[in-house]
UniProtKB/Swiss-Prot annotation:
It is found in: Cytoplasm. One of its GO terms (molecular function) is urease activity. It catalyses: urea + 2 H2O + H(+) = hydrogencarbonate + 2 NH4(+). The keyword Nucleotide-binding does not apply. The gene is ureC. This is Urease subunit alpha. Pathway: Nitrogen metabolism; urea degradation; CO(2) and NH(3) from urea (urease route): step 1/1. Its cofactor is Ni cation. It holds the Pfam family Urease_alpha. Carboxylation allows a single lysine to coordinate two nickel ions. One of its GO terms (cellular component) is cytoplasm. Keywords: Cytoplasm, Hydrolase, Metal-binding, Nickel. Ni(2+) 2 binds at K219, H248, H274. One of its GO terms (biological process) is urea catabolic process.
Amino acid sequence: MNYRIDRRTYAETYGPTVGDKVRLADTELFIEVEKDFTTYGDEVKFGGGKVIRDGMGQSPISREDGAVDLVITNALILDWWGIVKADVGIKDGKIYKIGKAGNPHIQDNVDIIIGPATEALAGEGMILTAGGIDAHIHFICPQQIETAIASGITTMIGGGTGPATGTNATTCTPGEWHIYRMLEAAEAFPMNLGFLGKGNSSQPEGLAEQVKAGVIGLKLHEDWGTTPAAIDTCLSVADKYDVQVAIHTDTLNEAGFVEATIAAFKNRVIHTYHTEGAGGGHAPDIIRVCGEMNVLPSSTNPTRPYTTNTLEEHLDMLMVCHHLDRSIPEDVAFAESRIRRETIAAEDILHDLGAFSIISSDSQAMGRVGEVIIRTWQTAHKMRVQRGRLTGETGENDNLRARRYIAKYTINPAITHGVSDYVGSIEVGKLADLVLWKPAFFGVKPEIVLKGGLIAWAQMGDANASIPTPQPVYMRPMFASFGGAIAKTSLTFVSKYAMKAGIPEKLKLKKTAVAVSNTRNISKASMKLNDALPRMEVNPETYEVRADGELLICEPATVLPMAQRYFLF
């Protein structure tokens, strides 16, 4: 028997389907469902009088015979590869299948089997994204990790040892002893973690020993002396051991100008932090490197997007983070040289063009660890309002722009740092690090954050209430954040050398350790939807930025979505 329902009722019951559009929070961005893997009239949904019951949507098939551990029903997936409606099956902490869930005994085309061993998570009316990756972390305090995961970040990559002066300024975990201690500390957190060693040395031995100890990359920072010799040596070590190099270049141009740094790269791949320059780098033209094939350019979030307040707040941030003294004129000049409205405005447009590939935080060191996702979508909104639809869009939606921007904090940092086999997208075989959002709160406040297929953080009300929803409702840690579950649902990333040398066993790490790979054979072309290579020019006197001859200029935003209306309580 057929029963016909109108589109609105269907969307309210099972979530949007092909042709329906969803607004992202209070932005001017609208995504449209491109494909629906579910079957009309045969959808699965959990609840009293609903479908997932024994003999109906739930089969008697055991876990051993193919039933999944968790099914997320009727979710709207937003990822770099597409925007689709589907059920998602999770098994052994990994994404098992994206498709149609149910009982194959009575339903057709079922590729996700629901059985007695299967838990259900309602995705109707929700947006499902991959957990975010923040690839510019100063590990200044462990509380950052709570803030990050509560915002939808599930992987953090960077360096540090706590609030030491070096860590406050540079993302480096220097030396074997510190590396071992940070790997041990990582055991406590429901977060995938990878550490960067100090990359500043003109001789390779001190760098190689850090890679052997377990870091997944090396960080070159001007506060430690980012000279052409140090750059060359660091990249040579990285090539030998297959780890990534991140760089904060020479703001003062003491050891050479941007041309000297590019020459020192020798066409070897490198991740350039805060490539616009306010966070540090050759003044005023480090932004030029985003046009180089071997450069993987990222932004940090304080300059995202360009607003009327951006310039004013940066000077104070910079003085603190880089241990500068307002009473020393040279220190003030150093700070002022890094803050340029022209390059910050250009950064907005370069992100929209796909010339900047990654957005990260620079946590507590001129960056906000809980705002990577918010700032990314605010930038996308600002560009939608100021520049209109992208030329590559098909249909009356913002799908291409949404896919481009989500790639900046998911798949692209994963590829850059050699962890894309494990995390960074919603694809079969990857760790089930997933985030569910109510569309009205998209990008601002997640509803549920899963780590390795288990709920790690979620919006939760009063624990003494008779139901889960009474106020105060806010993000709280759930069971994947406690006890032995942490080790089974989160990863520690190490170098291939450290993995083969048995460093995880030597340190008696319980958390699953995996090795990074393929960090040296990639390029800008590897960056999903963010691989543009414009010919860059910067006027050294006016700071005007041109890409392929076009002047990049935009007005600062005076008001933004995803802001104060979401944080009244």
